[in-house]
Amino acid sequence: LSKRYEGKLDGDADRFIDRTNQNVLRMQRLINDLLTYSRITTRAHPFLPTDCNQLVQEVVEMLQPVLEESSGRVVPEPLPTVMADGSQLLQLFQNLIGNAIKFKDHKPPEVHIDAERADKGWLFSVRDNGIGIDPQYAERIFLIFQRLHTVDQYPGTGIGLAICKKIVERHGGEIW
């Protein structure tokens, strides 16, 4: 409709069609995120040796346009090879790095990623210089559809960190 009737209707109609298109795109993102969330356990791949350095590099390449636009940068330290579902770890890094870039203040985003040996495996850390999270909301942000900001302030579906939590738990870990 927007292509067919662009400029042929009055301003109100154009705004209505534009708003409808935006809502359709938002609904499409929501459905895709819900499918991703539901498939974490139902369409999971077996755990294989997975190079986390390679995964982070892939995510940085995927997010390069956003990084350039925001003058942001990702600073990974050497990361381990772990037994994991590689596609899910890719999604995990993409969501965490993407959030670090999105939830920024006036400074260009800078995301640091590292890992250190822990008792039962590895402790990964994704830190940034963004707006931060009030400690009182630390658990709430990992619940599905929970947002701390309006869609107008920061776009998104409110599912990304719930996906992260489900992936981490499937891999026997915790996220905070």
Cite the ranges covered by each PLM segment.
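Short alpha-helical segment of the dimerization/phosphotransfer core of two-component systems
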Residues: 22-27
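A conserved beta-strand-to-alpha-helix junction within the catalytic ATP-binding
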Residues: 46-61, 112-115
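Short helix-loop "hinge" at the ATP-lid/N-box region of the Bergerat-fold HATPase_c
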Residues: 100-101
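Short alpha-helical Gxxx[C/S/T] motif in the catalytic ATP-binding
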Residues: 160, 164
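Detector for a conserved hydrophobic position within an alpha-helical segment of the HATPase_c
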Residues: 168-169
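Glycine-rich ATP-binding loops of the HATPase_c
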Residues: 172-176
